[in-house]
Amino acid sequence: MARIALVTGGTRGIGRAISLVLKEAGARVAANYAANDDAANAFKDETAIEVFKFDVGDFDACKDGISKVEADIGPIDILVNNAGITRDNPLHKMDPEHWDAVIATNLSSAFNTSRNVIDGMRERGFGRIINIGSINGQKGQFGQVNYSAAKAGLIGFTKAFALETASKGITVNAVTPGYIATEMVMAVPEEVLNTKILPLIPVGRLGEPKEVGRCVVFLASDEAGFITGSTLSANGGQYMT
């Protein structure tokens, strides 16, 4: 896979795994991050993956950031919209700023990045755009009206955008993970994990971040060229559509 890939939120959690698996598959990867310079530089030193700091929720920042990626590495063939945040609260307690922040980072970001790579993909006649959604965008989650709305919106974005790009050699798909063994999930008390979370998952375990990464690698491959507008659920059978 001699392609150039940009992974947003690509230095931590699921994004880190996606970056690593894409690199293992032969892609040249650029990993975007938002804030933690020390962690990003440590990731770069450990993995030899280039890192690029910009706010995916800001269109102009994306324009400048993607221009730098393409100047430093080359035209982007694969875009993985993975960046995401949570600001949880029931709606009756939710601050407007927390709604806006989650929508900006989890949904508007997909427009901001895609708009800045799509012209080049159309000119070259090839592109792979993979949007990382969530099981909570499919089934909803208490206290996550903002997050669930953003991730559900990402699925609609995927389907509509896929229709617009299908004739140009560009595919647009989504991956919706369930409970994945990231630092955040592994911080849950073991008793809660064993009694409240694992019983919800028919396969009886958490997903591994690299399993999500392998979904992305497949959808980014030449072999997946007949798949577009699809949502690939990676949730151990917790939610089936």
Feature-to-residue mapping (PLM):
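The beta1-alpha1 cofactor-binding region of Rossmann-like NAD(H)/NADP(H)-dependent oxidoreductases
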Residues: 54-65, 96, 209-211
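Short, small/polar-rich loop/turn modules that mediate ligand/substrate recognition or access, typified
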Residues: 166, 171, 227-229, 235
